Amino acid sequence: MKIVIPMAGLGTRFAKVQDQNPEYKKPKPFINVKGYPMVRWATGSLLFLEHPGQNLSGPLRVPMENLIFIILKQHDLEFQIEKQLKQIYSDKINIVKLEAVTRGAAETAYMAKEFLDPEEDVLFSDSDHYFDGKILEEIILKKGAKTAGVIPVFVPPNDGIARWSYSLTQAGTNNIIQVAEKDPELMNKGAYANIGAYYFSKAKYFLQEVEEVMEKNEVSGPSGKGEFYIAPLYQRLLNKGMELEAAVLPEVWGLGTPEDLEYFLKNCKINHP
């Protein structure tokens, strides 16, 4: 398995309030969260990724050389991102540097193509969350032969705001039957919210779909703010008769906004990833 961490966004929500906390002047993945960079909490959620000092023996074990980060070249020049990442993880990690911000998360993720084997599985994960990944690991290990992907999800708050991408499952099962980005209609059907990590049992399932949507310029999301998102690629797989499974996680923490981070610091009893 390859694990890809796209972190080539601008992180403007923290930058706008940097006068409140000197940490917010840093690139978001390196903001200090209980003594660890935020990105370390995100990768620590992936229990099968062998971090420095660990000695994993499970069948899903992913070594450091299979970890890929996607960063902005400008950020690297300003903040030595590559150097920091290698200090946190290993000199064996892979770094992709982009000249500019892309047209969305799916296009950013696609920039790791050179490191992906079309027949090998891949997991894409945001760098600004923390979750209990045990069930994700179990579902990946037990997935059916026809399963094209696994999406870790959680039960969203019932506040009527469609702020996530969503996965609707067949009643009484983990079988996903519909996926969409920030879709109020799907949310109102009782869909789970996607946490921002996406597993494909073969990288080609991702690569083929993202290449097609970019070629046709099929953007997703709210009107006027369309981007290339990863979640809608799964709906394309469903439309082709492929199967998807949801991994319903018991504990999920967003870290991507100042409000989310403050809530995590005040309420999460876990002190290290």
Which residues does each PLM region occupy?
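Conserved N-terminal catalytic core of the sugar/cofactor nucleotidyltransferase
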Residues: 1-8, 12-24, 31-32, 36-124
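Conserved beta-strand segments of alpha/beta enzyme cores
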Residues: 29, 92-94, 175, 243-245
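Alpha-helical elements of Rossmann-like donor-binding domains used by nucleotide-donor carbohydrate transfer enzymes
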Residues: 45, 110-111, 138, 232, ...
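Conserved beta-strand termini and adjacent loop/short-helix elements that scaffold enzyme active sites
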Residues: 70-72, 96-98, 152, 182, ...
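Conserved core of the sugar-phosphate nucleotidyltransferase
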Residues: 132-215
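Conserved alpha/beta core of the MobA/IspD/sugar-nucleotide pyrophosphorylase nucleotidyltransferase superfamily
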Residues: 191-273
